[in-house]
């Protein structure tokens, strides 16, 4: 049986946009969004990068910056912090962000072979399942129909590399939007401040 590369979860956290920066917001769906309503499968993606330091160094130096920069980035992508909701009072579903809504961020550690997983060759897809997070319901909004839109997982392969796993609802995010979001997060993380506007700051 193929090795499934189990991971050790070290931390679960909830990351929100900066408090009071947005207020409550409602965003209606467009005609083109309707096609992607659940039960359509989630978008899942993995981003690999080499990292030649220890888990201790990452957790104490890099991860706090990732959390802070993610919070700043979510201010510009606030629907991803919210939910897709559809209650009896609504004639159609909509994106709903309530101040304090958050994205799930998981920190994990793996003893798997980073270079094998990130290499340009055929691999067993089962080895990747543990690197992407799951989307779990939240009780912050009406439970009749409330779906979180984004979850993130950072898996560290000590002295080898890191993998950022993304699970997102396709109704809120396609591949192009995901790449735009990841570039924005990387830009804020590198600069240490919210230096966007996004359209001009991201290559």
Residue ranges, per PLM feature:
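Non-catalytic N-terminal regions of enzymes
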Residues: 1-203
């Amino acid at each position: 049986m193929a090795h499934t590369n189990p991971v050790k979860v070290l931390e679960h956290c909830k990351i929100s946009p900066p408090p009071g920066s947005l207020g409550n917001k409602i965003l209606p769906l467009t005609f083109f969004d309707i096609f992607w309503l659940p039960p359509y499968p989630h978008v899942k993606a993995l981003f690999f990068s080499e990292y030649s330091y220890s888990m201790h160094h990452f957790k104490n130096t890099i991860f706090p910056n990732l959390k802070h920069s993610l919070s700043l980035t979510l201010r510009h992508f606030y629907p991803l912090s919210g939910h897709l909701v559809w209650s009896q009072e609504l004639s159609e579903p909509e994106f709903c962000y309530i101040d304090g809504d958050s994205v799930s961020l998981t920190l994990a550690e793996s003893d798997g072979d980073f270079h094998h997983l990130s290499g340009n060759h055929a691999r067993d897809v089962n080895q990747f399942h543990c690197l992407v997070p799951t989307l779990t319901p939240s009780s912050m909004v009406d439970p009749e129909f409330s779906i979180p839109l984004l979850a993130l997982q950072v898996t560290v392969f000590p002295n080898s590399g890191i993998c950022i796993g993304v699970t997102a609802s396709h109704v809120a995010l396609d591949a192009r939007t995901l790449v735009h979001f990841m570039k924005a997060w990387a830009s804020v993380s590198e600069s240490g401040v919210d230096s966007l506007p996004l359209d001009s700051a991201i290559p």
